[in-house]
Amino acid sequence: TMKKVDVILGLQWGDEGKGKVVDVLTPRYEVVARFQGGPNAGHTLEFNGEKYVLRSIPSGIFQGGKTNIIGNGVVIDAILFREEAEALAASGHDLTRQLCISKKAHLILPTHRILDAAYEAAKGSAKIGTTGKGIGPTYTDKVSRNGMRVGDLLSPDFERIYAAAKARHEKILKSLDYQYDIAELEKQWFEAVEYLRRFHIIDSEYFVNDCLAQDKSILAEGAQGTLLDVDFGSYPFVTSSNTVCAGVCTGLGVAPNRIGEVYGIFKAYCTRVGSGPFPTELFDETGERLCDIGHEFGAVTGRRRRCGWLDMVALKYSIMINGVTQLIMMKSDVMNDFDTIKVATAYEIGGRTTSEFPYEIDGELKPVYTEFEGWKCDLRKYGRYEEFPEAFKRYVEFIERQTGVPVKIISVGPDRGETITR
């Protein structure tokens, strides 16, 4: 049989807990690859009692002897990359041998960060809540064919290409009448670019396909979540890349028929960062409880996340678009003390009920809930699925019946060991 690339994806609005799961899954793989996104999303991993937030570096970095790839669909901020790599090096993880970067990955320039802030300021109250890292403007340049790529670092024309891009950006900033000072940022960026040149800068599409030909196992890890996908998410409150499974093909150069298992991660409830529609959002004390017990604050930004009940309409939509083969449920333990737990199984829009994710989500939409009795106990004391309380198993099996996909991994606590595999 042909080796295939397995994929792990968030099925909600990001922050599903991918860091921990990738940690549980990576031992099975020889190669771990990132295929989209930039340093806006942080994966929090605990390793030997230390906490690390990885933003652009794949999570396979903690397991020695693995190859980690930053694919062509990723955008890289040299400054943040250097900070991240140096912090890892200080704790004994030498990346220069373990990490390869695609020549075709795009670079976030200092002026991209400033453009991000300028565009957001110009929007006033219509902000989409960007993380201000320059990711949107970098993808804009990529699509309008003005971008700079990692491979340009190896070109004798590098300085000229940079100067042209910078001049273009300065023109835009002038028209937006935005005041800024770039000297310090630019100095850091040029130093960081020198640092980036030490790494293996490769034709990653050949590399990935060579690995498959050599029967190596590969895991592609997504950042963010399906409902933030530029095509299928709640546009315009989305990210600038394709976060769905198809993004693996375009972001790594893997053919669609070489995609294997698709692991879909979801939280037992829902959260969303920043602005944008969120049908099951709770504005009451229950929402506060989910946030506090679940420690729902951003890994990179520290922003408080909006919380709500599990949205089955959205989950089924994500499963369909990604072709999910196995589900992974995170943070079940957050609801250990709840008397009643709800799941949205349909939406009511203007007097009619639908189980489809609509083109537009507005204030008219009301979720239709199915109620469950809480399990009211600490799930960590059980070692096997069979031992779980009936109430919890009813919740899990309801999700399986509704989606038609098995829930294979259940996380019952923050620790790596607090994971039940079926």
Protein language model features and the residues they cover:
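Non-transmembrane, aqueous-exposed alpha-helical and coiled segments at domain scale
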Residues: 2-422
